[in-house]
């Protein structure tokens, strides 16, 4: 066989191998698209970023958190619930109360209070906090959005009745197009949700975060477990690689008799990291920084990021009619790496 022929055959073979690799890669990408997990940091061949899990594992009560910025929102925000960040937008969930719920003397029909009336909002802002769109969510008695999570493509939002042991709708909002898709309905009040990028499943927490549930994307419940932690009620959570969930929230505790007793409350704030495989609380720490209106900073919307050993926390504890209105507060801290 001539040298020129051999070279042509080798070139042709290499081209076929290259084309096969491209086709295989395209097929894999299309499969990712069908499963709804494209674009996530936990998919593909990239190693997930574990900075946040590693850093939070050394956060203590003595971690020196410093407030570094305060972003005032100049539109009606009502009662804020959850926050999430995409590349281009800030998303803030909130409930507008039209008629408050009223407790029954004794439970009626399985409920401890009236449903009340309200409007669920998902505010879409640019990174400067300017309102770009107000998305209304909910149906009938289900008008109360909760904690939200951004999975790299979509923002997941639960909208529940404003009472325990009720029902909720799980929404998916495309972060780029802002298209809204009603994913499924569930029994019970679910006031928070995260997307587990390792499994492609959703995990939600009920009223007071007393119970967690895991679903597939069609709403089939795959597992449920009780929360072993009683320090705080989780208000807003986020997925953390690998297979963890970071939550923050608040518990209202009675004051001392001299300070008003049960008629007054002390807001205990805090954060907790939960293992989504073992369901154990890996680490929980209190957080006692205060807003303009005097609320603990982790009262409602909360998200955290890490870069190396540097942590950044975003919170929005005040309602639109409190203090200086809703402000997104930024706290930052450096932590020592684990030994």
Question: Model-flagged regions — what are they?
Answer:
Residues 77-82, 140-149, 186-198, 230-239, ...:
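Repeated scaffold domains used in trafficking and secretory/extracellular systems
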Residues 87-89, 152-153, 198-200, 242-244, ...:
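Short coil/turn segments that connect the beta-strands within blades of beta-propeller domains
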Residues 230-283:
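Loop/turn-rich, solvent-exposed surfaces of beta-rich toroidal or solenoidal domains
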Residues 66-73, 130-138, 179-185, 220-227, ...:
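A short beta-strand motif characteristic of beta-propeller blades
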């Amino acid at each position: 066989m001539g040298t020129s022929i051999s070279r042509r055959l080798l070139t042709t073979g290499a081209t076929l191998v290259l084309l096969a690799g491209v086709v295989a890669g395209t097929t894999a990408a299309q499969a990712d698209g069908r499963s709804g997990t494209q674009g996530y940091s936990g998919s593909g061949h990239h190693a997930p970023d574990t900075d946040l899990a590693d850093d939070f594992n050394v956060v203590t009560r003595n971690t020196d958190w410093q407030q570094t910025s305060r972003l005032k929102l100049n539109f009606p925000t009502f009662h804020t619930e959850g926050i999430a960040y995409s590349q281009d937008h800030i998303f803030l969930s909130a409930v507008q109360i039209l008629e408050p719920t009223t407790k029954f003397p004794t439970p009626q029909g399985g409920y401890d209070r009236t449903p009340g009336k309200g409007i669920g909002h998902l505010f879409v802002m640019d990174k400067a906090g300017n309102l770009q769109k107000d998305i209304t969510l909910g149906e009938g008695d289900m008008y109360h959005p909760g904690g939200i999570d951004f999975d790299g493509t979509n923002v997941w939002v639960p909208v529940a009745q404003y009472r325990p042991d009720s029902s909720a709708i799980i929404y998916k909002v495309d972060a780029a197009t802002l298209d809204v898709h009603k994913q499924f309905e569930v029994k019970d009040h679910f006031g928070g949700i995260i997307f587990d990028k390792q499994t492609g499943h959703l995990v939600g927490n009920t009223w007071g975060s007393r119970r967690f549930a895991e679903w597939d994307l069609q709403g089939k419940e795959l597992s449920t477990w009780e929360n072993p932690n009683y320090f705080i009620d989780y208000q807003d959570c986020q997925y953390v690689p690998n297979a963890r969930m970071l939550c923050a929230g608040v518990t209202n505790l009675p004051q001392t008799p001299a300070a008003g007793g049960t008629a007054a409350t002390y807001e205990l704030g805090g954060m907790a990291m939960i293992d989504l495989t073992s369901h154990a609380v890996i680490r929980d720490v209190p957080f006692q920084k205060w807003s303009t209106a005097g609320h603990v900073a982790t009262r409602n919307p909360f998200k955290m990021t890490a870069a190396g050993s540097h942590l950044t926390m975003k919170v929005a504890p005040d309602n639109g009619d409190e203090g200086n209105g809703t402000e997104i507060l930024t706290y930052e801290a450096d932590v020592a790496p684990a030994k």
